[in-house]
């Protein structure tokens, strides 16, 4: 496939692993041009955002310089956002109107927020997606006095803890966590849910195990009001971008690009996808940065194979259990691994070490360390 173009759409966790592979092992074949399309110069590591809110990190920490990483990998960086994909015509249209042609493409642009769709519209509503927009808005606003966090997954729980311990806020914000009907940390072991519930009580965070909604300008769960609230955070998971559903790629019932165990589109063999923009056709797989990180090297290997006119061979088989480290914002964290759990300052130290090691490896490769 020499003289051809590989287009990497999005700068998510999987694609930074592809860039790292290009740096370590060299570009994938003579004459192959790789282009990276991202709306932002930096990838913000979302796992460090709660720590930043709680004053444990600086705002500038947790960033991977995608442009610098691309330059070191021999990849052309184009700033822009994909708004349309034509897999048959092999082109992408960006938000500036530019059309980028490709021979092979990989999608790792993430999902989109669904706060307004699930809760309703309100000027106080702030979705965690896209994460960079979330960080910029939080950084620019005065400390809120009363916050409602909608979403009972690990992301929503961490944000509730972080906002209760918001750096520079005096008095500390009053925080309410509305988990949704699925409850607190669905899919996690009972021991972990119990430890998190205890920590919520200890920190004075109100817990509502019900769906939240905006009704006539008021935040509600059932017949109960969650008002007053200065800020409403939507941590409700990601929806598929419209352009994926409209592209003609095979998608699941919710519009995510269907891929096989090689992370190759089941309908268009020259398209690959990973992260929140994709869904596995062979098995259910929750959208999590953990899976995107581990899928990255698999994606890199398979892109190399396809660019060498070979069949993809590498497969991603998710581990039975994943390690989750939930920052409680007060100098501690709660670890979850299957049925096992632990809590304390040492768990937080482990989280910081893992997070900073991940960032540091890409900073070194990009030459920005």
What are these regions (language model features)?
Residues 2-75, 157-188:
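Beta1-alpha1 glycine-rich phosphate/pyrophosphate-binding loop at the start
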Residues 14, 110-113, 238-240, 331:
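Short glycine-rich anion-binding loops that position phosphate/pyrophosphate groups of nucleotides
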Residues 277-329:
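A conserved FAD-binding loop/helix module that cradles the flavin
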Residues 77-85, 100, 168-261:
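A Rossmann-like FAD-binding core segment of flavoenzymes
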Residues 330-369:
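C-terminal auxiliary extensions adjacent to catalytic cores
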Residues 95, 108-109, 209, 235-236, ...:
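Short, well-ordered coil/turn residues at beta-beta hairpins
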Residues 123-144, 226-294, 301:
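FAD-site-proximal beta/loop scaffold in flavoenzymes
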Residues 2-7, 72-146, 168, 220-222, ...:
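FAD-binding core/adjacent interface of flavoenzyme oxidoreductases
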């Amino acid at each position: 496939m020499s003289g051809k173009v590989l287009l990497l759409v999005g700068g998510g966790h999987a694609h930074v692993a592809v860039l790292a592979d290009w740096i370590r092992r060299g570009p994938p074949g003579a004459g192959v041009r790789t282009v990276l399309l991202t709306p932002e110069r930096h990838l913000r590591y979302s796992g460090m955002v709660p720590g930043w809110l709680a004053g444990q990190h600086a705002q500038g920490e947790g960033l991977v310089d995608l442009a610098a990483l691309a330059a070191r990998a021999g990849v052309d960086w184009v700033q822009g956002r994909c708004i349309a994909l034509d897999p048959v015509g092999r082109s992408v249209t960006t938000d500036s109107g530019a059309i980028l042609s490709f021979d092979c493409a990989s999608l790792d642009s993430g999902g989109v927020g669904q706060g307004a769709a699930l809760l309703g519209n309100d000027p106080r509503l702030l979705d965690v997606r896209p994460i960079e927009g979330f960080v910029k808005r939080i950084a620019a606003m005065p400390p809120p006095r009363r916050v409602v966090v909608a979403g009972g997954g690990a992301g929503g729980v961490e944000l509730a803890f972080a906002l209760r311990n918001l750096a520079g806020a005096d008095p500390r914000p009053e925080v309410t966590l509305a988990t949704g009907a699925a409850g607190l940390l669905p899919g996690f072991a009972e021991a972990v849910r119990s430890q998190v519930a205890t920590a919520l009580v200890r920190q004075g965070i109100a817990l509502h195990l019900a769906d939240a909604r905006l009704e006539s300008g008021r935040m509600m769960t059932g017949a109960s009001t969650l008002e007053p609230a200065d800020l409403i955070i939507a941590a409700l998971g990601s929806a598929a971008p419209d352009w994926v559903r409209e592209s003609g790629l095979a998608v699941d019932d919710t519009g995510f690009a269907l891929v096989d165990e090689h992370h190759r589109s089941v309908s268009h063999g020259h398209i690959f996808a990973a992260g929140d923009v994709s869904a596995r056709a062979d098995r259910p797989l929750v959208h999590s940065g953990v899976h995107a990180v581990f899928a990255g090297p698999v994606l890199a290997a398979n892109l190399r194979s396809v660019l060498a006119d070979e069949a993809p061979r590498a497969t991603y088989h998710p581990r039975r259990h994943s390690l989750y480290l939930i920052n409680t914002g007060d100098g501690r964290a709660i670890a979850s691994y299957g049925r096992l759990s632990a809590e304390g300052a040492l768990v937080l130290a482990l989280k910081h070490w893992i997070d900073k090691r991940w960032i540091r490896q890409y900073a070194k490769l990009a030459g920005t360390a």
